[in-house]
Amino acid sequence: MFIGRERELQELNRLFESGRFEFAVIYGRRRVGKTALITQFIRDKDAIYFMGVESSSKQNLENLSKSIIEYSSGIEADTSFLSFQSALEYVFNLAETKRLILVIDEYPYVARASKSLASTLQMLIDRYRDSSKLMLILCGSSMSYMEDQVLAYKAPLYGRRSAQFKILPFNFSETCRYFPHFSPEEKALMYGIVGGTPQYLLQMNDRLSIEENIKNTFLNPNSAIYEDPSSLLKQEVREPSIYNAIITAVATGASRMAEISAKVGEDTSICSVYIKNLITLGIIRKESPYG
């Protein structure tokens, strides 16, 4: 079931219909529906889809090669390109005669394993952007990596993208579309508890009560949601213990910097750095009282 993301799909289709080289960056927290958006976008188009894995450069190159060869020949093969440059250049050349999409999902996994990948992409984009009809999409769940290593001014790929999409959780109106059988009050309660993360919303059942849904997910050690907060944080930060302490402090009522630092047991100057990172990651947000 695919819900929402009409504006993102419209913009992606606009880029696709330009017929010239385009480079889109899609990023956001895990579970917000980035891959679902891409799958929906490319479902009726010529596309090579490759998902990076947290493994070696060799393994990722082999997987990319399989995706490319399967697309171009229609058969699975065990052969591999000799380098990322030769694999990617082959795709750029393929796209000189037809419109083609190349998706590299979980790009941070691939780029961390192959340190020269960003520079290779930079070189190929500069070489082929006027002749290739390729639409390149880089997607990543590590927001810190995508912002620092792809979008930042000092990143090799800076200035070459056509568009960037920061995929956020759904708002209340979009979330309600998941729960046609809930009353307005139940929809509001569910949004307040779960938020708008699509993968979490799909695990809720609007045929059950709010209480039953909470027991089946948040309070069930076997559910997919149960361990998600800690695992997601570990993927983004180096010292999850301090971040967890800050999140716990905020969740238990500490709202001012002095209160948070007192509960955490660290100076406000230290806590402020961690809090800034949590805000950037979209885990907490700052609200100023009105009046």
Annotated model-derived regions:
Residues 1-291:
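Phosphate-binding site recognition
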